[in-house]
């Protein structure tokens, strides 16, 4: 078995640089979408509905793109077609978003933006494993983490910096110029960064990957599918029952209508798992649904615990992304009118706050977590 060539620092840089641009786009979305929605007439109560694209596209797009990118090979490569398609669509969404004049168009553009970012971002996570030998994985993921943090800091700070350079932050008849220019610059940065990675890297072809001991293209692990075929339907009906219970509880307990979505997702997963199990039992397990559900059901216990942690952490993150701008604008800047200069000054300051938390998180991830992991 051959070993992959050692990558020098320049090679490590090229492999992960696209993530810098992707995170600029992601940070612009997180720090500014509530401001855009409210500027276009969305109420505070509407924000959670308008933001629903973000978690749903991640939930649906990531496993699908991950599944297909593992099984793709074209003359342009394995992951790079996804990089390119996602980057082009995300850049277009960033260019169009700040010129939205009606609320529903901005909400629709968010669906395109978030889905496109996920299309490009998900294969980037696997790209390090594809391109690097195992003894370089730590260095590769560390540099990727650095680019993630740097992109998030830069994207979050764009409107604040433009305001201090003299660009108007007033929302006169639409999105403020600071936000508009930030999205345009962010779209260009995202596209150029991803194109840099595409243009400076060459993926190993299937024969080379096989020589390195990697699974052959399209080769699927049969164990998850066999395990899925052997499963009973009890857990699937339990998911459906849990979802139905949540749906019933919403009016009884006067819960927010957004909770209906959680119940619907649990029901949908239960139905999907029944279909996946029946397909696996019928000898038709080599399909995306059975493979994805089989991988999910067969996760190690540690990963299931991590998934629970991620559930609560991402719940908190979305609450922060959705509501920080209106809360800071109202209580720290005394403004509730999204067209006012004070409100948009508050929106700029939220970008600074988000830049700080991203910067601190990156430093902790690079300096503290490796030492902590070594002790566990």
Label each region the model flagged:
Residues 60-77, 363-376:
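Helix-to-loop junctions at the C-terminal end of transmembrane segments
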Residues 33, 119-133:
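Intracellular juxtamembrane helix-capping segments at the cytosolic ends
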Residues 2-57, 246-252, 304-340:
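Helix-loop boundary and gating motifs at the non-cytosolic
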Residues 26, 112-124:
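Core transmembrane helices of Major Facilitator Superfamily
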Residues 81-102, 251:
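C-terminal ends and interior cores of transmembrane alpha-helices
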């Amino acid at each position: 078995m051959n070993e992959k060539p050692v990558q020098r620092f320049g090679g490590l840089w090229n492999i992960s640089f696209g993530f810098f641009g992707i995170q600029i786009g992601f940070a612009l979305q997180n720090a500014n979408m509530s401001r855009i929605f409210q500027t276009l007439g969305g109420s505070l109560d509407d924000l959670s509905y308008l933001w629903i694209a973000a978690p749903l596209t991640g939930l649906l797009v990531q496993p699908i793109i991950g599944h297909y990118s593992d099984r793709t090979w074209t003359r342009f490569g394995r992951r790079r077609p996804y990089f390119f398609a996602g980057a082009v669509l995300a850049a277009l969404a960033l260019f169009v978003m700040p010129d939205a004049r009606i609320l529903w168009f901005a909400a629709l553009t968010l669906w395109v933006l978030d889905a496109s970012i996920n299309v490009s971002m998900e294969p980037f996570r696997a790209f390090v494993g594809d391109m690097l030998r195992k003894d370089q994985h730590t260095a590769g993921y560390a540099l990727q983490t650095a680019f993630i943090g740097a992109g998030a800091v830069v994207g979050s700070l764009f409107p604040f910096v433009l305001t201090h350079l003299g660009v108007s932050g007033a929302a006169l008849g639409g999105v403020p110029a600071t936000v508009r220019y930030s999205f345009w610059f962010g779209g260009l940065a995202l596209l150029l960064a991803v194109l840099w990675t595409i243009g400076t890297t060459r993926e190993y072809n299937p024969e080379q990957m096989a020589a390195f001991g990697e699974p052959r293209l399209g080769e699927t692990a049969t164990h998850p599918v066999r395990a899925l075929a052997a499963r009973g339907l009890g857990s699937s009906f339990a998911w459906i029952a849990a979802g139905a219970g949540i749906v019933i509880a919403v009016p009884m307990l006067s819960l927010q209508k957004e909770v209906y979505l959680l119940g619907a997702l649990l029901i949908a997963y239960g139905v999907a798992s029944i279909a996946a199990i029946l397909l696996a039992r019928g000898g038709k397990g080599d399909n995306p649904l059975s493979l994805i559900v089989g991988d999910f059901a067969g996760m190690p216990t540690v990963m299931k615990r991590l998934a629970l942690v991620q559930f609560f952490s991402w719940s908190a993150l979305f609450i922060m992304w959705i509501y920080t701008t209106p809360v800071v604008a109202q209580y720290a800047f005394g403004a509730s009118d999204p067209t006012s200069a004070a409100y948009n000054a508050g929106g700029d300051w939220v970008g600074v706050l988000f830049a700080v938390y991203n910067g601190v998180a990156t430093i902790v991830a690079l300096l503290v977590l490796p030492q902590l992991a070594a002790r566990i």
